Curated annotation (Swiss-Prot):
Free-text cofactor note: Binds 1 zinc ion per subunit. The zinc ion is important for the structural integrity of the protein.
Enzyme class, spelled out: oxidoreductase
Signal peptide: none
InterPro entries hit by this protein: Met_Sox_Rdtase_MsrB (IPR028427), Met_Sox_Rdtase_MsrB_dom (IPR002579), Mss4-like_sf (IPR011057)
Name used for this protein in its record: Peptide methionine sulfoxide reductase MsrB
Binding site for Zn(2+): 47, 50, 96, 99
Assigned keywords, A-Z: Metal-binding, Oxidoreductase, Zinc
């Protein structure tokens, strides 16, 4: 996969302030505030920064945590996992494999079949209809 690389100024000009803060500066949207937290429509969730398909809506579930949650990415190669020790915690950050956008974190407390919970900020993704 060919990487997309831009300067922070280029990203800032493309994204709204909240998208920039979360996707490029590794921020977090407030729980229960994102537009996709309760979303039930079918489709594919894409990276807001580069359009890479990330999650199938059929893998979305209600974790009750305040952020959209998925039990699997559309492909393992769609994201990169990075050890995150910020805020006094040990977590696994997930970023877009194509543009390095911060998406959220993955936790080992999800449902079958994977047992994983990809906890993703709504501002980082865009739900599109299936082709």
């Amino acid at each position: 996969m060919k990487k997309i690389e831009k300067t922070l100024d280029e990203w800032r000009s493309m994204l709204d302030p909240e998208q920039y803060q979360v996707c490029r500066l590794k921020g977090t949207e407030r729980p229960f505030s994102g537009k996709y937290n309760s979303e039930r429509r079918d489709g594919i969730y894409h990276c807001i920064c580069c359009g890479l398909p990330l999650f199938d809506a059929q893998t979305k579930f209600d974790a009750g945590c305040g952020w959209p949650s998925f039990y699997a990415p559309i492909e393992d190669s769609a994201m990169i996992e990075i050890r995150d020790t910020s805020h006094g915690m040990i977590r696994t950050e997930v970023t877009c494999a194509r543009c390095d956008a911060h998406l959220g974190h993955v936790f080992p407390d999800g449902p079958p079949p994977t047992g994983l919970r990809y906890c993703i900020n709504s501002v980082c993704i865009d739900l599109r209809p299936r082709d």
